[in-house]
Amino acid sequence: MANSIQDALYLSFEREQWAELRKSVPLTLSEAELTQLKGMNEKLSLDEVTDIYLPLSRLLNLIVGAKQQRGLVIDKFLSQQAPKSPYIISIAGSVAVGKSTTARILQTLLQRWPEHPKVDLVTTDGFLYPLAELKRKGLLQRKGFPESYDTKLLGEFISAVKSGDNNVKVPLYSHITYDRLTDQHQVIAQPDIIILEGLNVLQTGLDTLVETRRPFVSDFVDFSIYVDADESLLKDWYQQRFLQFRHGAFNDPRSFFHHYATLSDGEANAIAANIWDTINGPNLQLNIQPTRERAKLILKKGKDHLISQVLMRR
């Protein structure tokens, strides 16, 4: 059934077909820059950037340009200049699918187009309730589920930047302490484009209770991307990443997960599998994957994190 829905809604491109749509867009990313951009456990190459992300940056540049031209037409009609409003691109998908890497690559490529040199990247992690609040609400085991986010604060932020407000503060999140930072903020100062990356950015007001319904992130997004992969791959990638964190971030005494640093491979693998089966997997099945067909573009990953298919809304 899902395939028939996708066939009706999307144009499908195999990797080679999509790569041809790059046309003459030059590759301006070096191997050293790519190393800094890619996430843990991702075998990302310049070929992947050339075949997948350059055509995507070309598409987005054309779409953003059309939106900017439309804005000029509206300004002319109203005989006044409206406040600068950023073009907002959202990137959704499961834990461990590589959303952050996709976001960083697109940010780097898009800001090298002269039409929109200022591109900011915002992650919704900063809008998770503080750790103490999650514990108080009994939501620690549902972290990442829609109810664990301060959607009011997130909505206020996205509304402010879309309205053209300047110097809008965004809360930051520490993956070491597993908590929102209280003394640091990201400041958004009227960029040309905002890339908003998070698990549930395709969620709509229809997904919430009627009495709490309010404008949601998706109401303000101009272009949405969903990074997709089979759950068996996602679980495997999550377990691999957990094992790598055990030798890296978990060794930091400040880490919320420091107690996992001394686990054996077998113990760590079992705990990671349990976290997936009880938290990340159910969240994917109940809240994240059902929003996939709301995206304007779906990037379908296969083994080794390589994108094998691109689906674009008709």
Swiss-Prot record:
Its EC number is 2.7.1.33. Transmembrane segments: none annotated. Keywords: ATP-binding, Coenzyme A biosynthesis, Cytoplasm, Kinase, Nucleotide-binding, Transferase. It comes from the Bacteria. It catalyses: (R)-pantothenate + ATP = (R)-4'-phosphopantothenate + ADP + H(+). Pathway: Cofactor biosynthesis; coenzyme A biosynthesis; CoA from (R)-pantothenate: step 1/5. GO terms for biological process: coenzyme A biosynthetic process. Belongs to the prokaryotic pantothenate kinase family. NCBIfam families: panK_bact. This is Pantothenate kinase. It comes from Shewanella denitrificans (strain OS217 / ATCC BAA-1090 / DSM 15013). The gene is coaA.
